[in-house]
Every structure is written in structure tokens, then in C-alpha cells.
Regions:
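Short Gly/Pro-enriched turn/cap motifs at secondary-structure boundaries
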Residues: 1-3, 76-79, 85, 98
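Substrate-binding rim/cap in mid-to-C-terminal beta-strand-loop elements of soluble/periplasmic
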Residues: 1-48, 52-64, 91
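A structure-centric signal for secondary-structure junctions around beta-strands
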Residues: 5-8, 51, 65, 82-83, ...
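Long, internal low-complexity/basic segments
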Residues: 7, 120-164
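A short aromatic-rich beta-strand->coil structural motif
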Residues: 10-11, 37, 89-125, 133, ...
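Active-site-proximal beta-strand/loop segments in catalytic clefts of secreted hydrolases
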Residues: 14-15, 73, 98
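WW-domain-binding short linear motifs
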Residues: 67-72
Length: 164
């Protein structure tokens, strides 16, 4: 969930509609790609698709957009050996929860610490920010249908396969 893996460039070319040199600063997620491409193809996406079309953002016609993104990584143990984690990123802050065989939280101020080297989670000066991010994180997990019980289900399923 660190910036080096979270921020991925995307290049699009559609001269009929997209002006050259457009740069988007809004929080776009990979789950927005399919709805956007379907939108350009004039196809209505299925209700099950979680993402949003960012076509209006590319065309500079949309002012309101999400103020946070939810992220989850659950492929542990695996090749990368990165612990399971989920979190939320806003324009300024990032809250990450590592779970499964650990229970660790990280909080970063991306404006003051863009390299994410100073974990502020235990800093009492950031309790109100932490509380606000926890609330938003809970809302987004509910919105996307993620939960601790779902995590436990997948973990137990994985462990049973490994033990057989």
C-alpha cells in the first residue's frame, strides 16, 4: 500500500475525445478501468462492477469524486512475502492495517512525509485524524463488501488447502 506500488501511471489515447497532455490528480483505482472503457464504448456496466467511470474527469467535466481509496492485499504467504493488509488513502493521509499473523497499524502524513518513513499511529497528536480515518475505512470496507469475517474465511480456506 506504499506509494511506490499504489501510484501507477496510466496512458490513454482517444483523439476523438481526450485532449493531449491531460493529467489527472484524482484518486483513480484499477477497478475504475473497466467502467471507464465501457463508458467510452457506450456500454452500461453491470451492477456488480465496483468501480466508477472517470471519463468525465478526463474530459474535465467532473468536480466531485471520491475523497479516499480503499486498498487490500491478501496474498500472504506468497512469492513477495508481504503481510496481508488493507487500508485507506486520502489526499493527505494513509492508514494501513497489517493482519493475519500480526496486528499492526501504520499512519502517514503524505504531505509532510511523502516517503512514508515516520509512522504516526501511536502519536497522540494524530488521534483525531486516526479516528476519522478508521471511520472512513470502516465505511469503505462495508461499501466494498470486505470484513474481518470474510478475511478469516479466506485465511481458513487457504490454510486447509495447505494442510491437505
Amino acid at each position: 500500500m506504499y506509494e511506490e506500488s499504489l501510484r501507477t501511471p496510466l496512458l490513454m489515447k482517444y483523439p476523438k475525445e481526450i485532449k493531449p497532455g491531460i493529467k489527472i490528480d484524482q484518486m483513480i483505482q484499477n477497478l475504475d478501468f473497466a467502467p471507464t472503457l465501457l463508458d467510452y464504448a457506450n456500454i452500461n456496466p453491470s451492477q456488480e462492477i465496483q468501480g466508477l467511470s472517470f471519463r468525465d474527469i478526463v474530459n474535465q467535466n467532473q468536480s466531485n469524486w471520491r475523497d479516499a481509496i480503499y486498498y487490500t492485499y491478501y496474498e500472504y504467504p506468497s512469492v513477495h512475502m508481504v503481510k496481508r493488509h488493507y487500508g485507506i488513502r486520502t489526499d493527505r493521509y494513509k492508514l494501513i492495517h497489517f493482519y493475519y499473523d500480526i496486528d499492526e497499524w501504520e499512519l502517514y502524513d503524505l504531505k509532510k512525509d511523502p516517503s512514508e518513513m515516520n509512522n504516526l499511529y501511536s502519536d497522540p497528536k494524530h488521534k483525531s485524524i486516526q479516528k476519522s480515518l478508521h471511520k472512513k475505512l470502516t465505511e469503505l470496507r462495508k461499501y466494498y463488501g470486505d470484513s474481518d469475517s470474510l478475511n478469516k474465511f479466506h485465511i481458513n480456506s487457504y490454510l486447509s488447502k495447505m494442510n491437505n
